[in-house]
C-alpha cells in the first residue's frame, strides 16, 4: 500500500490528509477554501490519487495559512506514500489545455525540492481565492515531498482556466512519475542507488 497520512496542527490551522497513490481518483476535500477544494479534486481525479482532506483554519483573516498548511500536509503525505521511491518512473511531464489556456508541468521525484514557477495569472482573485496562493501551494508541496517541479504557462488569458490547467497538468505529471515501472523490478530509479528527501542524487 502506497499511502500517507498526516495530521498537522498549529496555532493557525488543523489539517488532516490521507493519500493513496494507487487509488481511483476519489476525493473528499473540505478545507474551508472552496476554490482550493476544487483544485484538490483536479489532482485526485486526473492523478488517480485518493485524497481525504479536512482543514480548519483562520480563514476569517485570509486563506493564506490554510492554503499553505494543506500544501505542506499533502507534500508530507506524498513523501510517506512514495517511501524510498523504489520502482517508480521518477520523472513525469504533461501539457494540459483548458480552452485557451495551456500549461506544462514537468517534475522529478528526486528528493531535492525545487520549484520553477511560470504562471502569469491576470487577476488577483478567482472568486474569493487570492491567485498568489497558487504558487504558495506548490512551493509547500514541493518542499515537503522532495519534488523538483517546473511549471510553465504556454498560453491563456482566463485566470480560472490557467490555474485549473496547471493543477490538471500537475496531476497527470505526478501520476506518470509515481506509477510503478515494471522494467525496474523494484530498483531505485537513480544511478546512485538512493533517492532521499534531502540530499543530492
UniProtKB/Swiss-Prot annotation:
It catalyses: D-erythro-1-(imidazol-4-yl)glycerol 3-phosphate = 3-(imidazol-4-yl)-2-oxopropyl phosphate + H2O. GO terms for molecular function: imidazoleglycerol-phosphate dehydratase activity. Its main location: cytoplasm. It is found in: Cytoplasm. The lineage of its organism: Bacteria, Bacillati, Cyanobacteriota, Cyanophyceae, Synechococcales. PROSITE patterns: IGP_DEHYDRATASE_1, IGP_DEHYDRATASE_2. InterPro entries: IGPD_sf, ImidazoleglycerolP_deHydtase, ImidazoleglycerP_deHydtase_CS, Ribosomal_Su5_D2-typ_SF. GO terms for cellular component: cytoplasm. Signal peptide: none annotated. Keywords: Amino-acid biosynthesis, Cytoplasm, Histidine biosynthesis, Lyase. Pathway: Amino-acid biosynthesis; L-histidine biosynthesis; L-histidine from 5-phospho-alpha-D-ribose 1-diphosphate: step 6/9. Belongs to the imidazoleglycerol-phosphate dehydratase family. It comes from Synechococcus sp. (strain CC9902). One of its GO terms (biological process) is L-histidine biosynthetic process. This is Imidazoleglycerol-phosphate dehydratase. Its EC number is 4.2.1.19. The keyword Heme does not apply.
